[in-house]
């Protein structure tokens, strides 16, 4: 059997392609059942996010797997395969396992090290499990992937630094104030960047978030999302003396030509710093404002510098996670090898039981004078001897099966004890039966 993943993501397909291959949440159970009915598929999990659609399967035939999965996608989405095949990637066995581990750890995400994908991987696995879509292989693999993803974030610092402009603005504010508790925030502009910044600030414990916009209705709409206070741009200028943090992202008016008004506001609040972040292009806030006493002004270039430094730090942490992934891949490979030992041990036990019974039958036929009690004693004694004789070989082959030469050890063990006839047809024993080097 083999592990395969077929998918597309933000690297291989633009958004107009990705949105055509997005599984609706309500349709996922049906999609999984359809996938599991696909020829050669034994287990299946579908991970579907805005940035990726990936189909993980355990199959019994590798050479036709790609064709079968593409056919499934063609049927489900109603899109001819010629229109999407060039956007697909396909990983097999070892590469498929490595890819899943990287996805779960956030190393394959658009934002390196993000944590949302880990929850999505777990949810996809649990959904498939409820739909009876996972078996021995994926139950082990996906649990291991989720555990590894948690370790990656708890044992490294990959998620502890801002890599978006909006979050970098918040991180910068924390450096100055230490905490947003008791702080008032004024946001100029109600666009996407302002919304993200307001979300981070509100989540960081700011007492009040005031939103000003040229269109008052839009200010009301954004303020309502964070239990904030809307106001007009003129009112915002009048409230400068009351706020601790100002984020400007209008790209139009901001507080240009208001140096004098800012200076007067600062005189009304002696010894209280005002933290200003200008994330607009062109800039909203005149650089001259930044030289006023107790005013800390930063623009988007300052924030991009922080983001780049943080990205470098995340890349360094990703190297550590890559090492963790390689270690976990070996753990999974060893586990796969141990699956092959079960039918071998069972075959040995069945052969030993057959020899034991036939030998006792022969002996009892030659000694008809033995009563039932004597026969039971002989049966227990000989079975105890047999079990003791098998104890060490069984424990040793269990250990060896999990090692690097596990497949070879199973083959040799099978030959030494002549177990071929006792093995179940198609039992996964020996080299080439379990594919994950």
From Swiss-Prot:
GO terms for molecular function: glutamyl-tRNA reductase activity; NADP binding. NADP(+) binds at residues 189-194. PROSITE patterns: GLUTR. Its EC number is 1.2.1.70. It is an enzyme of class 1 (oxidoreductase). The active site is at residue 50. Substrate binds at residues 49-52, 109, 114-116, 120. The keyword NADP applies. Disulfide bonds: none annotated. InterPro entries: 4pyrrol_synth_GluRdtase, 4pyrrol_synth_GluRdtase_dimer, 4pyrrol_synth_GluRdtase_N, GluRdtase_CS, GluRdtase_dimer_dom_sf, GluRdtase_N_sf, NAD(P)-bd_dom_sf, Shikm_DH/Glu-tRNA_Rdtase. It catalyses: (S)-4-amino-5-oxopentanoate + tRNA(Glu) + NADP(+) = L-glutamyl-tRNA(Glu) + NADPH + H(+). Keywords: NADP, Oxidoreductase, Porphyrin biosynthesis. GO terms for biological process: protoporphyrinogen IX biosynthetic process from glutamate. Pathway: Porphyrin-containing compound metabolism; protoporphyrin-IX biosynthesis; 5-aminolevulinate from L-glutamyl-tRNA(Glu): step 1/2. Pfam families: GlutR_dimer, GlutR_N, Shikimate_DH. CDD domains: NAD_bind_Glutamyl_tRNA_reduct. The record marks 99 as: Important for activity. PANTHER family: GLUTAMYL-TRNA REDUCTASE (PTHR43013:SF1). Catalyzes the NADPH-dependent reduction of glutamyl-tRNA(Glu) to glutamate 1-semialdehyde (GSA). Possesses an unusual extended V-shaped dimeric structure with each monomer consisting of three distinct domains arranged along a curved 'spinal' alpha-helix. The N-terminal catalytic domain specifically recognizes the glutamate moiety of the substrate. The second domain is the NADPH-binding domain, and the third C-terminal domain is responsible for dimerization. During catalysis, the active site Cys acts as a nucleophile attacking the alpha-carbonyl group of tRNA-bound glutamate with the formation of a thioester intermediate between enzyme and glutamate, and the concomitant release of tRNA(Glu). The thioester intermediate is finally reduced by direct hydride transfer from NADPH, to form the product GSA. Belongs to the glutamyl-tRNA reductase family. Homodimer. This is Glutamyl-tRNA reductase. It comes from Paenibacillus macerans. The lineage of its organism: Bacteria, Bacillati, Bacillota, Bacilli, Bacillales. The gene is hemA.
């Amino acid at each position: 059997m083999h592990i395969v993943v077929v998918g597309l993501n933000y690297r291989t397909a633009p958004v107009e392609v990705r949105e055509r291959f997005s599984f609706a949440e309500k349709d996922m159970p049906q999609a999984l059942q359809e996938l599991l009915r696909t020829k050669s598929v034994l287990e299946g999990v579908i991970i579907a996010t805005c940035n990726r659609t990936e189909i993980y399967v355990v199959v019994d035939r590798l050479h036709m797997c790609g064709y079968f999965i593409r056919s499934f996608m063609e049927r489900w989405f109603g899109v001819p395969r010629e229109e999407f095949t060039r956007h697909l990637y396909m990983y097999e066995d070892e590469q498929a396992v490595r890819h899943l581990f990287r996805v779960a750890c956030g190393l394959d995400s658009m934002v390196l090290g993000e944590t949302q994908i880990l929850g999505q991987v777990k949810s996809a696995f649990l959904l498939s499990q409820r739909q009876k879509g996972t078996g021995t292989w994926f139950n082990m693999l996906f649990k291991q992937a989720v555990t590894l993803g948690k370790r990656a974030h708890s044992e490294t610092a990959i998620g502890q630094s801002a890599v978006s402009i909006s979050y970098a603005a918040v991180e910068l504010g924390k450096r100055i104030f230490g905490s947003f508790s008791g702080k008032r925030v004024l946001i100029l502009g109600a666009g996407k960047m302002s919304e993200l910044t307001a979300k981070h600030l509100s989540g960081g414990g700011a007492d009040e978030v005031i939103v000003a916009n040229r269109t008052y209705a839009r200010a009301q709409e954004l303020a309502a999302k964070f239990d904030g206070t809307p106001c007009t741009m003129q009112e915002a200028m009048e409230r400068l003396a009351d706020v601790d943090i100002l984020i400007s992202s209008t790209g139009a008016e901001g507080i240009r030509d208001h140096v004098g008004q800012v200076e007067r506001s600062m005189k009304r609040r002696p010894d209280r710093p005002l933290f200003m972040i200008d994330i607009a292009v062109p800039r909203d806030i005149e650089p001259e404002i930044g030289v006023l006493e107790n005013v800390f002004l930063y623009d988007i270039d300052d924030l991009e510098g922080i983001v780049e430094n943080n990205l470098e730090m995340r890349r360094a942490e990703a190297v550590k996670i890559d090492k963790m992934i390689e270690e976990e891949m070996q753990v999974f490979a060893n586990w796969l090898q141990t699956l092959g030992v079960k039918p071998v041990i069972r075959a040995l036990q069945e052969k030993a039981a057959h020899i034991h019974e036939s030998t006792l039958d022969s002996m009892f036929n030659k000694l008809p004078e033995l009563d039932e009690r004597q026969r039971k004693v002989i049966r227990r004694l000989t079975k105890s001897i047999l079990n003791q004789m098998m104890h060490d070989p069984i424990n040793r082959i269990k250990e060896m099966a999990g090692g690097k030469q596990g497949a070879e050890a199973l083959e040799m063990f099978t030959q030494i004890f002549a177990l071929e006839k006792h093995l179940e047809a198609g039992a996964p024993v020996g080299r080439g039966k379990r594919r994950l080097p």
